Amino acid sequence: MTSTLETRTVTRWVSLRPHHGQVPAEDLVDGPLYVEPFSAADLPAIAERAAGVVIGSAWMQDFQLVRAVARLGLPVIVQRGHSATLEEWLGVADYCVAEGNDQVVLCESGTRTHLEHVALDLTLLRAAKARSGRPVLADVSGDPSLAPAAIAAGADGLLLSPSASDADVAAAREAVTLFGALAGHEPPTTLPEARAAIDRVDAALATLLERRAELAGVVQSLKPVGGFAGRDMERERQLVAAMALRAPKLGEERLAPIMNAVIEAGLRLAEER
């Protein structure tokens, strides 16, 4: 469970709705996590024990409860109702702000289709980010395999089912790390944010370097002459030139020694196998 909601995160939470008010909130909220209340009766325990509140898609138009939640002063995640428009969704965030709480994060929860499935609307997610200027999560509870697509579309984080398996959580975190490194364009404003962004880029870079080394090993096995003796310097120059088009600030002069080190590491690895 996360105690704070930062961008590029995976958030787990607990919902009190399935218990229909039959179980006291005190028995279910046992740590700093995000909680979806069943009714206003749950709010005192949430205020005392929770790190934040989830305004679930099923009751985002219960404006009395929305206002009461906002007055707790905790961070709020506003899920979009499955049939709610963009304006209705953003309007709930405005209700929270009107109560003096601007700690609002939006969460795209999907639209119910004619097949009775709920499908994420990534276009609406991007529109919500552009219109509101707020972080927007993607609820991938129904299909955690959509995590990479959601992050690539610009989601600032993912919301998983309270019952998500450890494997689903691990896969979602990997999607946030790898795809977040490629999709994130907002400049960090603090040192911890900047370091976290660099860590994500480094993780993605390590994954790509490992994959490149594997492919280089395949190439060595297919070439008539492999290893250092079979290096194709002209191809390597073309590779660096092509990379410089993607990384013009680094340019060929800086990229050349980097790629030489990468290529030599791959060749040595191939020789060791």
Stretches with model-predicted labels:
Residues 1-18, 115-119, 170-196, 209:
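Surface-exposed amphipathic alpha-helical tracts and adjacent flexible/coil segments at the periphery
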Residues 43-44, 147, 195:
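Short hydrophobic/charged patches on amphipathic alpha-helices used for structural packing
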Residues 3, 10-75:
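Active-site beta->alpha loop and helix N-cap motifs at the rims of alpha/beta catalytic domains
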Residues 51, 156, 202:
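Conserved acidic residues
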Residues 178-273:
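Extended, charge-rich alpha-helical interface modules
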Residues 18-25, 81-84, 116-120, 167, ...:
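Catalytic cores of large soluble enzymes that bind and process phosphate-bearing ligands
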Residues 13-31, 164-167, 219-230:
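Glycine-rich, proline-tolerant flexible connector loops at the mouths of alpha/beta enzymes
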Residues 61-189:
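Catalytic alpha/beta core domains of metabolic enzymes, predominantly
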